[in-house]
């Protein structure tokens, strides 16, 4: 029996695509690539498959586009804590300089900066001053035969700024006595200020285990309005208010009290209920935050306020070759002349182009404190006489100078506000996988089947191509070498013995 296939029988053999279609797990293609002629059924299956594939591509492209839009969602949660670290509290008297501490040398160097004297070192508007204050100022501003001495802005602010030891009438933390020694001196744009629970100098951070009044910081202050500088003009440093400015902030964040602080007025007891918020932001491309671990030139931990102060410091040093007292670094302090002529105008110019020069992004991890303020009038009619006797001050003085500040946690919990990626890679793969299963019944393994088929197809084509090239090369060598050898042997005499003929055959094999 002849096993060789006839041409008609060979044409009925399935092609490789038909074999793949009938063995693949991809739905629908086995009905398209069937044995036999083209039918309407095959066409309908092809249309259905192509349509499903098109819908899959549309839905998948929409999901991919949504993923690369880098959307985020915000999760808010309340967490109950066993204890909470009490925040840092920075407070500044709105009057930065005590009038009684000014000397003739101070007025000679800084009188114009303080707006007490004009450019000629004269009192500009004496009719606006209180007679007693005017007389004291005239005595201090008498520069006849005066020889000026050296002047230091740092020493000046230390000496002339309000002393917390004199301002503080009492202090309690969680019902326990505290004092001025529990505060750290810091410098801000308001001059000499004080920070409670700074954690500096190796002091442990104070904690609280209860919420509500009586479980935080309570202080009574005398703002000493009698020491306020007289005002007869307006400058950048002029303040018309009386009281203290307070900022509640994290210990890792420097105070920026001139913009982030709130005011506390004399004659009132102010209650500040606060709640800690822990915020987590996403870095680019999902958000715009910057890692808190990426320090700055003058601060080890990044924060918005640290970035602002760092930027202002670099700008002033670059333009004025000095720095203000509240600015970090090792550049020399600005003189009063540099303050008025360069530093203050430079800060004003910087504020105008702040968005272009000082780009301070939100840190990825941030702790802030929400505040709810309420206040009551002090003293009451029944307590006025007692306070007059206790502090040896009149009722009018108490209402104009004394204030009480009570800061406490509203409850022993904190709020977390966290940005999360709205759409991650796992969700993208899940959606695309679901669409693949819905429209074409495919999976990852089906994709691997396609790649495997393409690989085998390419390998077969390459092997066929290489086989043809080898066959052609072998045929050429047989014609050129092996055909010439017999011709060469014909020239040999017939008397050649058999061993020689055997040797010749071996050489022919090697040559071929």
Swiss-Prot record:
The modification Phosphoserine is found at residues 8, 11. It is a multi-pass membrane protein. Expressed in brain, cerebellum, trigeminal sensory ganglia and also detected in testis. Disulfide bonds join 92-193, 289-364, 307-360, 311-358, 320-342, 322-334. Keywords: Cell membrane, Disulfide bond, Glycoprotein, Ion channel, Ion transport, Membrane, Phosphoprotein, Sodium, Sodium channel, Sodium transport, Transmembrane, Transmembrane helix, Transport. A motif (GAS motif) lies at residues 441-443. It comes from the Eukaryota. Pfam families: ASC (PF00858). One of its GO terms (cellular component) is postsynaptic density membrane. It catalyses: Na(+)(in) = Na(+)(out); K(+)(in) = K(+)(out); Li(+)(in) = Li(+)(out). GO terms for molecular function: ligand-gated sodium channel activity; monoatomic ion-gated channel activity; pH-gated sodium channel activity; voltage-gated sodium channel activity. Residues 65-424 are extracellular. InterPro entries: ENaC (IPR001873), ENaC_chordates (IPR004724), ENaC_CS (IPR020903). Glycans are attached at residues 365, 392. Residues 1-42, 440-512 are cytoplasmic. The chain crosses the membrane at residues 43-64, 425-439. Belongs to the amiloride-sensitive sodium channel (TC 1.A.6) family. ASIC2 subfamily. Forms pH-gated trimeric sodium channels that act as postsynaptic excitatory sensors in the nervous system. Upon extracellular acidification, these channels generate rapid, transient inward currents that fully desensitize. Highly selective for sodium, they are permeable to other cations. By forming heterotrimeric channels with ASIC1, could contribute to synaptic plasticity, learning, and memory. Additionally, as acid sensors at nerve terminals, plays a role in mechanosensation and phototransduction. Can form homotrimers. Heterotrimer; forms functional heterotrimers producing channel with different properties. Forms heterotrimers with ASIC1; while ASIC1 determines current amplitude, ASIC2 influences the properties of the current. Forms heterotrimers with ASIC3; resulting in channels with distinct properties. Interacts with STOM; STOM regulates the gating of ASIC2-containing channels. Interacts with PICK1; promotes ASIC3 phosphorylation by PKC and activation of ASIC2/ASIC3 heterotrimers. This is Acid-sensing ion channel 2.
